[in-house]
């Protein structure tokens, strides 16, 4: 059975984990509605690529 020859220190372990991070969602400005929305998704007002394709979401 494979066993590590040396103990992995806390610093070495934590340096390996520095690449795990959150990425910001891609947000684009919609000129039709004047709002920001995520790309490739319908805006809250029902627009996608400048065209109305769905009813606006109502606040209940």
Swiss-Prot record:
MF-aspect GO terms: structural constituent of ribosome
Biased composition (Basic residues): 7-20
Source organism phylogeny: Bacteria, Bacillati, Bacillota, Bacilli, Lactobacillales
Any Pfam family the entry gives: Ribosomal_L32p
Region span, Disordered: 1-21
A single GO BP: translation
Family: Belongs to the bacterial ribosomal protein bL32 family.
Key words of the record: Ribonucleoprotein, Ribosomal protein
Organism for this UniProt entry: Streptococcus thermophilus (strain ATCC BAA-250 / LMG 18311)
NCBIfam families tied to this protein: rpmF_bact
SUPFAM superfamilies noted in UniProt: Zn-binding ribosomal proteins
GO cellular component terms listed in the entry, alphabetical order: large ribosomal subunit
Protein name in the entry: Large ribosomal subunit protein bL32
């Amino acid at each position: 059975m494979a066993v590590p020859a040396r103990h992995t220190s806390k610093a070495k372990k934590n340096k390996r984990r520095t690449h795990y991070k959150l990425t910001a969602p891609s947000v684009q400005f919609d000129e039709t509605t004047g709002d920001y929305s995520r790309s490739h998704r319908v805006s809250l007002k029902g627009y996608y690529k400048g065209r109305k394709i769905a009813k606006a979401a109502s606040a209940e």
